[in-house]
């Protein structure tokens, strides 16, 4: 399943904070949204939340911006939608 992510840099914690429609808002402690460190951190946060391995998270678009498109494998679309519904 493909989801959109909005990265919020310079945060105190690394976490998913909310969802606006189908866009996840992810806080990261890194300063730059365009670094490999930030991209890997976003993948790690998303993988932990959805209960999949980091290798099952693919960054499809937005490697250098705040808006990223991520593909999640290893769970059905139904399971992912259920987890998305848990986010305020």
Question: PLM ranges: what are they?
Answer:
Residues 47:
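The alpha-helix within a helix-turn-helix
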């Amino acid at each position: 399943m493909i989801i959109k992510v909005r990265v919020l840099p310079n945060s105190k914690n690394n976490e998913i904070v909310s969802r606006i429609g189908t866009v996840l808002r992810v806080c990261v402690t890194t300063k730059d949204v365009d670094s490999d460190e930030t991209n890997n951190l976003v993948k790690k946060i998303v993988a932990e939340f959805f209960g999949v391995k980091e290798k099952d998270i693919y960054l499809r678009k937005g490697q250098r911006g705040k808006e990223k498109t991520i593909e999640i494998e290893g769970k059905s679309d139904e399971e992912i939608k259920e987890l998305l519904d848990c986010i305020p």
